[in-house]
Amino acid sequence: MREGLSVGHEAQLELLVSSNEIIRLGGTTPVFSTPSMINLMEHAARKALAPYLEDHEESVGANVTVDHLAATPIGKRVRAVAKVTAIDRALIDFEITAFDETEQIGKGTHRRAVIKMGKL
């Protein structure tokens, strides 16, 4: 891994909730799904690490713990933020949060492991 990554470094990603990211509660109300929220959070963490990876390295998810706090309907924007909280050699811990246009909709922690691509 390249030098320079530090605790506090963060990255963000946004998406507009579409029919691709929803689940229907009780079959009628389409809302942003928990797996889609986690996917966005993980990709924000990956984005935070990307500039520090060597050409032969990749980061993979090793752990995720998330609370989904509020429902978000189709057509609303969601923003995920991943902030580095700890660095232990090849293990990077993140605080992950998600917000829609109204409120915080998710929070949790995520760990990524930096691996050599030849070991996949």
How would you describe each model-predicted region?
Residues 7, 73-74, 83-120:
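HotDog/MaoC-like acyl-thioester-processing domains
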Residues 12-18, 67, 109-113:
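Generic structural detector for well-ordered beta-strands
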Residues 34-38:
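Conserved N-terminal beta-strand and adjoining loop/helix that marks the start
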Residues 39-43, 47:
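Short, residue-level hotspots on alpha-helical faces of the histone-fold
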Residues 46-79:
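Hydrophobic beta-strand-centered segment that forms part of the acyl-chain substrate-binding groove
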